[in-house]
């Protein structure tokens, strides 16, 4: 309140000064006799004597008239009033308009020198002008200013002011503004994805693993599933019956040299089998169950050649060429055949070689190729060339039927472990991405290690150096098989296996480097059998 009284005095002083200057300019421009802002002052006025403005006689004067001067407000703060004007404007906006920012106000007030809150005597002309101007401004804002002034006068008379109080208030306002700005900066730096990682970076990782959970027997799981009675079985049968109305359309597309691909939620094995039996009963049918985990391209091509009543060749590439030459022959004895693939996106079929072989068979005009998919991203399996070879017409065949046969071989978590492990899938993925010479080096190492395992009793995979091969001897044997040209090339090819922990090395007592594959015997046999298809 004391600060408001000080601001009020400065505000009235500024208003009186501006009013007198405006009247003076108006008088000089129009040379009016009615203006009362010019007073005849004697050349030697008496100091300390205050004359009544009502007794003064106005006269028309010019700036050149000697002995006459313009009455100016005198006071301690007459010379520099720019900071005071800004301070008065800020306080008026704070109390009257209510649109003042605290941060801006505190910083602006800091630019103004701290004034004492003790009452200072006003200029005589200012005091008279203040009394004469009373009651002119009757707006609501003016009324609020007068009320504040009266309250401030009472507070000034009862409480002595001290300069330290004002300094303390200014310091508090400055600290409040700085704290608000610092809080805003802290909030701005904590937004976005950085805050997420900062928040969860200190969380501890649990030491629990899935291997600690009890394993459910596979047969118990199957028996429990059979006992479950689905309430939507009737609706499922209705949906299958509705889908069967499209059998004629699908058969028409097959006759016009298009292949069929069915997608949608639910098992489609029995549904597609019924379609083939009803619409294509006169044609030989070859079925591939892609959900079987141990399915290999060599086994599929060998069975397909036996289906065609032809003796299979030795290698996979020869069997594929042999199959294509038979089904594309004009004198093909069987005429048309049906090639049905359940789950063409199965784990065993997603290999690029497998998909290329199936696409080559599907491109034959003597083959009615029908397949089903269950993965939502099945389209990523094929590039433009394979997609053109398949020549699929896709249909939604949602049945909501239970995946009974498809999940029988699945290695589900918490259920009886299947023979195929994730390690086998990872190793196969790495091998398929390597050149032929690198795969030949790995196959040569597998053959040597399996031979040593046959002679070793109670072999432990953690002691693989016992069945490993010495580095220098292994390099010479690979060079004899033309798998590498020099030792740097041989070392660079082994680097890929070292990076994926497929091959490990260790130095023995004689400081010789030993190489071996740190996996169980059954896994090595599966890998070797799969690699023998390339022979």
Curated annotation (Swiss-Prot):
Residues 166-175 have a biased composition (Basic and acidic residues). GO terms for biological process: DNA replication initiation. Residues 132-184 are annotated as: Disordered. Changing residue 62 to A: Loss of phosphorylation by cdc2 and enhanced rereplication induced by overexpression of a cdc18 mutant lacking four cdc2 phosphorylation sites. One of its GO terms (cellular component) is nuclear replication fork. The keyword Phosphoprotein applies. Changing residue 62 to D: Does not affect function on preventing rereplication. The modification Phosphothreonine is found at residues 44, 57, 62, 65. InterPro entries: ORC2, RecA-like_ORC2, WHD_ORC2. Keywords: Chromosome, DNA replication, Nucleus, Phosphoprotein. One of its GO terms (molecular function) is DNA replication origin binding. Component of the origin recognition complex (ORC) that binds origins of replication. It has a role in both chromosomal replication and mating type transcriptional silencing. ORC binds to multiple sites within the ars1 origin of DNA replication in an ATP-independent manner. Together with cdc18, plays a role in preventing DNA rereplication and resulting genetic instability upon cell cycle-regulated phosphorylation by cdc2. ORC is composed of six subunits. ORC interacts with cdc18, recruiting it to the ars1 origin of replication. Interacts with spb70. Interacts with spp2; preferentially associates with the unphosphorylated orc2 in G1 pre-Start prior to orc2 being phosphorylated by cdc2, the interaction is mediated by spb70 and might enable the association of the whole alpha DNA polymerase complex to orc2/spb70 complex on chromatin. This is Origin recognition complex subunit 2. The gene is orc2.
